[in-house]
């Protein structure tokens, strides 16, 4: 397939979880004015931490930054879809109004299993495909994401999912994205059930591609200029009680940043002409991946917006 070329692409990669400090290029250092450069966004997900991404997207739009291409996996896929359609305000509205029961629910049978003797519970867990039901997210995605608008949008969209059957990554674009594919990209195996699409069992693309930076660089072709941002902090300590849910959330938080940073290093090696940075929250979010409501969501949105403005101030764009 012939790759399209987007000259003057500025690449902004948004990371959501806080990693331990690593060696990386300086964040948002003053340099050439990138105001006229087009911008590519890469969203990494992180469950409820996607609220931070929404704030960043809104902050960029408020400053007149033109997004030419956007890629996402996991929760970042939904964010990427609404940015591709030019609906950053709607994206923020979604995050401000979302609640846990609009994203997932515990199947009634799972609750019943907790009342059964241990050996029966183990048998039950061998019969089910996931801890939580993502049906509410399907309804939410259908309500907010206008597929026709995405297909007509000038902003190029890339969404990553993983096919459990073949073990291969799948990249979907404006032309073939669907609501089911967006849900599939957020379906962490074991936590949420795989989504069957055209004979494939699709799950969270972030398992193999936390932030699809390399996909974006490959699919958009040569890049002349780049607007990039990086920031990092320390992970929030795991507090008791050590429930299964908290352990799963903590595992996801620790697994996310390492691959994102390694991919950025690889991208810098492959594309020395592009300055690539990772924008992480400037302050701890104190937001758990499955915590889709409350003041912390609102705070994450505002922090993302503030960080986007601060980054552009330093870049002169």
Mark where each language-model region is.
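A short alpha-helix-loop-beta-strand transition element characteristic
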Residues: 101-106, 145-156
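Conserved small-residue
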Residues: 46, 56, 76, 141, ...
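Sec/Tat signal peptide C-region and signal peptidase I cleavage site
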Residues: 20-23
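Short glycine-enriched nucleophile-adjacent loop
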Residues: 77-88
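Bacterial N-terminal signal peptides
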Residues: 7-18
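Short helix immediately C-terminal to the catalytic nucleophile in hydrolase catalytic domains
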Residues: 53, 79-80, 213
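Non-catalytic peripheral regions of patatin-like phospholipases
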Residues: 35-39, 88-140, 164-165, 169, ...
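Helix-rich "cap/lid" substructures immediately adjacent to catalytic or cofactor-binding pockets
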Residues: 25-70
């Amino acid at each position: 397939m012939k790759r399209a070329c987007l000259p003057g692409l500025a690449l902004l990669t948004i990371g959501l979880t806080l990693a331990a400090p690593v060696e990386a290029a300086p964040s948002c250092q003053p340099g050439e004015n990138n105001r006229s450069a087009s911008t590519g966004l890469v969203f990494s997900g992180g469950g409820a931490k996607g609220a931070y991404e929404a704030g960043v997207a809104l902050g960029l739009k408020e400053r007149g930054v033109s997004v030419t291409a956007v890629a996402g996996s996991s929760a970042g896929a939904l964010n990427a879809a609404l940015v591709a359609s030019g609906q950053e305000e709607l994206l923020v509205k979604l995050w401000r109004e979302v609640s846990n029961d609009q994203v997932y629910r515990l199947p009634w049978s799972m609750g019943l299993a907790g009342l059964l003797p241990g050996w029966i519970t183990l048998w039950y867990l061998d019969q089910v495909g996931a801890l939580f039901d993502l049906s509410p997210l399907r309804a939410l995605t259908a309500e907010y994401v206008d597929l026709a608008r995405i297909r007509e949008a000038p902003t190029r969209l890339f969404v990553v999912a993983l096919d459990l059957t073949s073990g291969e990554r799948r990249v979907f674009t404006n032309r073939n994205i669907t609501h089911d594919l967006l849900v599939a990209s957020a379906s962490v195996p074991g936590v949420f059930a795989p989504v069957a699409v055209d004979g494939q069992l699709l799950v969270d693309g972030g398992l193999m591609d936390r932030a699809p930076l390399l996909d974006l660089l490959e699919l958009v072709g040569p890049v002349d200029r780049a607007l990039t941002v990086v920031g990092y902090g320390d992970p929030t300590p795991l507090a008791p009680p050590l429930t299964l849910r908290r352990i799963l959330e903590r595992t996801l938080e620790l697994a996310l940043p390492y691959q994102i940073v390694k991919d950025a290093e690889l991208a810098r090696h492959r594309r020395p002409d592009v300055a690539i940075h990772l924008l992480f929250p400037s302050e701890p979010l104190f937001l758990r991946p499955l915590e889709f409501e409350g003041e912390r969501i609102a705070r994450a949105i505002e922090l993302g917006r503030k960080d986007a403005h601060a980054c552009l101030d330093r870049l002169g764009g």
